[in-house]
């Protein structure tokens, strides 16, 4: 996440970036970056998705990232990086960027300029419903807390 934050701070998109998840030693002084921390409540997590336009998954490695399905279920496009492009698996609304400012800016602008069309296309995805998403998140939280 820190590599992405460094890159984001150099981008001139007039955008805000929010971080959700466990992370120690996060010291963010940029007013355009907000840190939520770990969010256990499924409804709060859904609200966070709904309050944002794009999800960015800055991971270098991933197995089956729930954040992608959660974002797509809320019809929020996702930007991932080349390292993990194998996770796309025919899903609409996932965009691959190189890990550089120009590529990321280009993808972000494309998504924002075509947002409604992208969201419409994302309806073709077979994804969890809101109810099943809440259940999946709740089950994960229960498992991690036991």
Label for each model-derived stretch:
Residues 1-10:
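A conserved mid-protein helix/loop that constitutes part of the nucleotide-sugar donor-binding site
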Residues 24-40:
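Nucleotide-activated donor-binding/catalytic signature segment of Leloir-type glycosyltransferases, i.e.
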Residues 38, 93-102, 108-115:
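Conserved acidic donor-binding segment of nucleotide-sugar-dependent glycosyltransferases
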Residues 46, 65-73, 85-87:
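Short alpha-helical segment that forms part of, or immediately flanks, the ligand-binding pocket
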Residues 46-52:
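Short alpha-helical donor nucleotide-sugar binding micro-motif in glycosyltransferases
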Residues 60:
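Aromatic "clamp/platform" in nucleotide-sugar-dependent glycosyltransferases that forms part
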Residues 77-81:
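Short hydrophobic beta-strand element within catalytic cores of glycosyltransferases
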Residues 99, 115-146:
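A charged, aromatic-enriched C-terminal amphipathic alpha-helix characteristic of glycosyltransferases
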């Amino acid at each position: 996440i820190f590599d992405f934050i460094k890159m984001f701070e150099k981008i001139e998109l007039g955008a805000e970036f929010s971080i959700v998840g466990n992370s120690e030693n996060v010291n963010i002084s940029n007013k355009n970056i907000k840190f939520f921390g770990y969010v256990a409540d499924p409804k709060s997590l859904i609200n966070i998705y709904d309050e944002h336009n794009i999800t960015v998954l800055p991971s270098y490695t991933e197995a089956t990232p729930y954040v992608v399905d959660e974002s797509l279920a809320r019809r929020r496009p996702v930007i991932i990086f080349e390292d993990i492009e194998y996770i796309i698996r025919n899903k609409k609304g996932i965009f691959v960027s190189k890990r550089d400012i120009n590529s990321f800016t280009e993808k972000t602008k494309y998504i924002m300029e075509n947002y409604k069309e992208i969201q419409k296309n994302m309806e073709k995805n077979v994804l969890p419903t809101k109810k099943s998403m809440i259940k999946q998140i709740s089950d994960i939280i229960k498992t991690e807390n036991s």
